[in-house]
């Protein structure tokens, strides 16, 4: 039986950071893959707000040659520490990928 698309995606993204996919254990919010330092949960969606990609592209375009563009998102009156940090997967892999477990 062929893999579901999401399983193949989890394997592909896990390989990019030097690890393997964790099989589903029934935990609703469990990690899809882990490294020594990070626990990842991958979400592939048909619809993600276009403005998010536009804003990320904007900061990546203006970042210097040796800089990584990072988009920080938060809601009004929310704690600074709860903000989301978004960067391109390719930049993440450049920084943290190919890690041997």
Show where each model-derived region lies.
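Catalytic phosphate/metal-binding cores of nucleic-acid and nucleotide-processing enzymes, i.e., regions
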Residues: 1-101
């Amino acid at each position: 039986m062929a893999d579901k698309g999401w399983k193949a995606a989890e394997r592909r993204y896990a390989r990019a950071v030097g690890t393997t996919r964790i099989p589903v254990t029934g935990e609703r919010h469990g990690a899809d893959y882990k490294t020594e330092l990070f626990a990842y949960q991958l979400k592939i969606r048909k619809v993600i707000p276009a403005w998010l990609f536009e804003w990320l592209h904007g900061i990546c375009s203006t970042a210097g040659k040796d800089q990584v563009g990072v988009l920080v998102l938060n809601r009004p009156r929310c704690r600074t520490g709860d903000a989301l940090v978004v960067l391109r997967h390719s930049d993440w892999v450049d920084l943290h990928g190919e890690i041997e477990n």
